[in-house]
């Protein structure tokens, strides 16, 4: 089905207000969920909203909590999210990293005791729109087996890197081949995954999203490489924030809350003049996209460039929402 941005935001807002969330907070949170969905990231927008409300109802998310600064060390700051709303707090933390970068050339905010930030790419994009390089990542509950294991002991720990090119170039990727959100998107659409995304119950690689969702044997990105990246990203976020690791979140909490996150902004213009920056970025993009195609019908893509097209299509034609997901939201 198709819905407008206004319908989507109103639906989110209604549910949030019914839970006693303050009017201004509910409006800002509903706006972010709707913008994420409008941008084409359904997995971490509309599809994720019922799960967000479940955690709100369970008390994992404290809607009136505010992040609190703990430590300042020049360009580095450490904050405690105090289990506030994840996407609103993440936006504030990247804003703060940008402010630090304006003063120091680089800014780093390490956040502990945070909630799921929904679409991580929103915060990298936020920095790149202002002319900064944006880098951020989060740890999570253990939802992926380390390479060579059957049991989930590491997080998908998504990493975002956004570059202020025209259009913005951005990698937004979990350390698994697919996020659980994208497994859901493909299952709801009745599609197999384009490449292997995990293991079946017999230990064979599979493209069936529903099987992987059920047995939780998701495949690390690049096999042992994604497994290793997940571990070191967790270590850095834990140390810099003095927060909880994947092990602590998984073993000590009843659900995925109290995670650790990193937000970095770099002011490129302190290092290179604008025309030179733009020319260098354009040369990189042209060099990549003019490579001989392996398939004449398949364009060579640059990461993140599709979001501009998806946003325009959704604004023109309406936002696609799965019927079953919309029914869940209406029932909340």
From Swiss-Prot:
The lineage of its organism: Bacteria, Pseudomonadati, Pseudomonadota, Gammaproteobacteria, Enterobacterales. Its EC number is 1.1.1.130. Belongs to the LDH2/MDH2 oxidoreductase family. DlgD subfamily. It catalyses: 3-dehydro-L-gulonate + NAD(+) = 2,3-dioxo-L-gulonate + NADH + H(+); 3-dehydro-L-gulonate + NADP(+) = 2,3-dioxo-L-gulonate + NADPH + H(+). Keywords: Cytoplasm, NAD, Oxidoreductase. The keyword Protease does not apply. Homodimer. NAD(+) binds at residues 168-174, 224-225, 304-306. Pfam families: Ldh_2 (PF02615). This is 2,3-diketo-L-gulonate reductase. GO terms for molecular function: 3-dehydro-L-gulonate 2-dehydrogenase activity; NAD+ binding. GO terms for cellular component: cytoplasm. It is found in: Cytoplasm. The active site is at 44 (proton donor). It comes from Escherichia fergusonii (strain ATCC 35469 / DSM 13698 / CCUG 18766 / IAM 14443 / JCM 21226 / LMG 7866 / NBRC 102419 / NCTC 12128 / CDC 0568-73). Catalyzes the reduction of 2,3-diketo-L-gulonate in the presence of NADH, to form 3-keto-L-gulonate. Transmembrane segments: none annotated.
């Amino acid at each position: 089905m198709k819905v407008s941005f206004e319908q989507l935001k109103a639906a989110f807002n209604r549910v949030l207000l019914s839970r006693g969330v303050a009017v201004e907070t509910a409006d800002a949170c509903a706006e972010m969920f709707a913008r994420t969905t409008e941008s084409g990231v359904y997995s971490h927008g509309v599809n994720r909203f019922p799960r967000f409300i479940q955690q709100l109802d369970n008390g994992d998310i404290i809607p009136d909590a505010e992040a609190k600064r703990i430590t300042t060390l020049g360009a580095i700051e450490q904050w405690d999210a105090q289990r506030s709303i994840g996407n609103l707090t993440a936006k504030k933390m990247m804003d703060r990293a940008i402010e630090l970068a304006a003063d120091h050339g680089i800014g780093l905010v390490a956040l502990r005791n945070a909630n799921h930030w929904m679409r991580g790419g929103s915060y990298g994009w936020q920095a790149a729109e202002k002319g900064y390089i944006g880098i951020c990542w989060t740890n999570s509950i253990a939802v992926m087996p380390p390479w060579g294991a059957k049991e989930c002991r590491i997080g998908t720990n998504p990493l975002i890197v956004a570059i202020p090119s025209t259009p913005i170039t951005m990698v937004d990727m979990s350390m698994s081949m697919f996020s659980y959100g994208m497994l859901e998107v493909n299952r709801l659409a009745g599609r197999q995954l384009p490449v292997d995304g995990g293991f079946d119950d017999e230990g064979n690689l599979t493209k069936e999203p529903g099987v992987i969702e059920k047995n939780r044997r998701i495949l690390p990105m690049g096999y042992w490489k994604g497994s290793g990246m997940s571990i070191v990203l967790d270590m850095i976020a834990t140390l810099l924030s003095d927060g909880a690791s994947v092990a602590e979140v998984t073993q000590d909490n009843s659900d995925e809350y109290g995670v650790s996150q990193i937000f970095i902004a770099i002011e490129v213009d302190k290092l290179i003049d604008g025309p030179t920056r733009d020319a260098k970025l354009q040369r990189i993009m042209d060099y990549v996209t003019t490579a001989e195609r392996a398939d004449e019908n398949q364009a060579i893509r640059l990461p993140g460039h599709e979001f501009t097209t998806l946003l325009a299509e959704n604004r023109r034609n309406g936002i696609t929402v799965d019927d079953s997901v919309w029914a869940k939201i209406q029932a909340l």
